[in-house]
Each structure stands twice: as structure tokens, then as C-alpha cells.
């Protein structure tokens, strides 16, 4: 009987361990980001260890956040779907494509925006003053042909300028380049004479004589609009509710830091980005009124409607809340 009792206790203990293991949240959360000041809020989250702090406050004291840097939104999407990372940061169009494709399976949802700062198309071609002047010899560098935020913004601008049927008018002019490589090409007199840019590359490009603006995402949106969001899978959300909440709280705190302490925000960017910019330069960039960082989703349905109309996504979301986790529904999004 003693042996049997010990066996029962051992069995119960094992069951308890299995149960605890099955319900335990992850102790390492991996987040994929891309280069540039677009990701400033995430840089702050990384530098100040905000996920670890908020997770500890929620009863998860041993959490560690790892940040992985990838070149383009499609790479981020692939990393999330494969399970290589838990949370991705990508443009609204790449996310919408993934959201449409994974409904009923992986079922991705947006967690938070990470900025509403403008994406800006610049050129060094003196003959091109507006997008209507772009010709067959021009080449536009952007992070992903046909799929990135910049690519879809260019299509939306083409549809507005030439009619809906002409939305792909500029697609043959586009080439895939990460922002650092695109800036180098633009300023080195290569065949690439246009770059759909973002900070801090934009400010460095515009400092060069002859480089000028053709189009901004603000023009396309008709005002500030979310250009990037963080997202994750149903599997991660259901298995890690405290981590999900900790991440959202971390992003909210990071946005407050940007508005209340730009110096600290600039220090975080310089510390983790690898960009060879001074803290003073970065602080001046993010102090520009056009650099909008906020947690409220804006304009996502406008992009979704365009992508649905062109057939890029097969499902039209009922409203912006269909795209985001329920924790975000209290915001006045669009």
C-alpha cells in the first residue's frame, strides 16, 4: 500500500507538473522589427526592457524579450507564420494580406500600431516634379515590390491620378531595396533615382541638393494614417494572455516616452538601431510635427477597401476592430 500510495502521489505530482507546463506562458518572446525611426516605439520597448517590466508586474518574473531585425514586411510575415518569432512589426498592407489569408487557420490579429509618421516618395530627377511626370526610365526603390506599404501607397496614388484601372501604372518602375541600400543607391547616381523613404533616411536624403518630395502617405490618407502595426497569431494570443497584455502596455508606455521625453526616446534609438546618427540628430527628427507616433489605429479600413477593390485581399473586414485584438477596441480607431 505504501508503494501504491507513493505511486499515486508521484502520478499526481507528474499530472500537476504537466498541467502547469501546459498552462505556463512563454519565458522568451521574440519580436521581428525592421530598420528605421518608423520602429522607434519598439526600439524604446527593447532598450528600456518594458516587456520584462510589465510581464513581471503581471506575475511573470522570468520573461526575456528578444528582437530580431529583418529587411522587409514579407520576411516578417513569414517569420511569424513559421513560429520563428512570436510578434511581428510590418506595414498595414502586408498585414492585411496575411489577415485575409489566415482567417480560420493561423488567424493573425493586429496588436498595436507602431507609428503614423509619413512615408515619403523622393527623387533626384530634376524633370520629375510630381508623380504624373514619372517615366519608363525612372526606378523607385521600396521595401517590397507590390506588397509593402510603399507599394500600395503608390498604387493608391496612381489610381487617384489616372483612374482605378491604372492602379498598377508605376509597378514596373519599382525595385525591392531595404531603406539603407535604397538611400545609398539614390545618392550614388545609380539607375535608382527615386526612393519611397522614411525617417531617418528621408531627412538625410532631403539634405542633399536636388533631392525633392513627390508624394507622401499623408497625401494618400488625407491626413495622418497608421503605416505600421504589430501582430501575432491566435496560438500565441491564447497561450500567452499575460504576455500579450504586457506587450500592449509596453507599447503604450513607449508612445508616452516619445511625447514626454524625446531625449530618452532618441537615446533608445541610437543605442539599439546601429544607425550612425547622433542623439541630437534623432531628437530633432522626432520633434518634427509630421512625425506622428500614436497607439490609435487610423486609416486601416481605407487601405483595406483599396486592397479589396483591387483583389489583393479576398475578404473585406467588417470594421477596424475585426483586424485588432479586443484589448484595442476601446480606442477611437478607423
Where in this protein do the model-derived segments appear?
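Positively charged n-region of N-terminal signal peptides that target proteins for export
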Residues: 1-3
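Short, glycine-/small- and polar/acidic-enriched structural segments
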Residues: 25-167, 172-176, 193-199, 223-224
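Secondary-structure end/capping motifs
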Residues: 238-314
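N-terminal export signals
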Residues: 7-24
Amino acid at each position: 500500500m505504501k508503494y501504491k500510495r507513493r505511486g499515486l502521489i508521484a502520478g499526481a505530482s507528474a499530472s500537476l507538473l504537466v498541467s502547469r507546463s501546459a498552462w505556463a506562458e512563454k519565458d522568451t518572446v521574440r519580436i521581428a522589427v525592421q530598420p528605421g525611426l518608423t520602429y522607434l516605439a519598439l526600439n524604446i520597448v527593447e532598450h528600456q526592457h518594458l516587456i520584462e517590466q510589465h510581464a513581471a508586474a503581471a506575475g511573470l518574473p522570468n520573461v526575456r524579450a528578444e528582437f530580431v531585425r529583418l529587411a522587409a514586411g514579407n520576411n516578417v510575415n513569414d517569420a511569424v507564420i513559421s513560429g520563428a518569432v512570436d510578434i511581428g512589426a510590418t506595414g498595414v498592407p502586408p498585414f492585411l494580406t496575411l489577415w485575409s489569408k489566415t482567417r480560420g487557420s493561423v488567424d493573425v490579429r493586429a496588436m498595436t500600431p507602431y507609428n503614423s509618421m509619413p512615408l515619403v516618395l523622393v527623387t533626384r530627377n530634376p524633370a520629375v516634379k510630381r508623380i504624373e511626370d514619372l517615366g519608363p526610365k525612372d526606378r523607385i526603390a521600396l521595401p517590397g515590390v507590390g506588397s509593402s506599404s510603399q507599394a500600395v501607397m503608390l498604387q493608391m496614388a496612381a489610381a487617384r491620378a489616372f483612374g482605378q484601372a491604372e492602379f498598377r501604372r508605376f509597378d514596373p518602375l519599382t525595385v525591392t531595396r531595404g531603406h539603407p541600400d535604397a538611400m545609398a543607391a539614390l545618392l550614388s547616381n545609380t539607375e535608382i533615382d527615386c526612393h519611397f523613404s522614411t525617417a531617418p533616411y528621408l531627412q538625410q536624403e532631403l539634405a542633399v541638393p536636388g533631392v525633392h518630395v513627390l508624394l507622401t502617405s499623408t497625401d494618400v490618407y488625407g491626413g495622418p494614417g497608421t503605416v505600421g502595426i504589430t501582430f501575432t497569431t491566435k496560438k500565441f494570443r491564447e497561450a500567452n494572455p499575460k504576455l500579450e497584455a504586457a506587450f500592449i502596455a509596453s507599447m503604450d508606455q513607449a508612445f508616452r516616452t516619445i511625447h514626454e521625453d524625446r531625449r530618452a526616446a532618441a537615446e533608445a534609438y541610437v543605442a539599439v538601431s546601429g544607425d550612425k546618427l547622433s542623439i541630437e540628430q534623432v531628437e530633432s527628427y522626432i520633434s518634427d510635427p509630421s512625425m506622428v507616433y500614436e497607439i490609435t489605429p487610423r486609416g486601416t479600413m481605407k487601405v483595406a477597401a483599396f486592397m479589396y477593390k483591387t483583389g489583393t485581399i479576398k475578404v473585406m473586414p467588417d470594421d477596424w476592430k475585426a483586424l485588432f485584438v479586443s484589448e484595442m477596441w476601446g480606442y477611437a480607431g478607423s
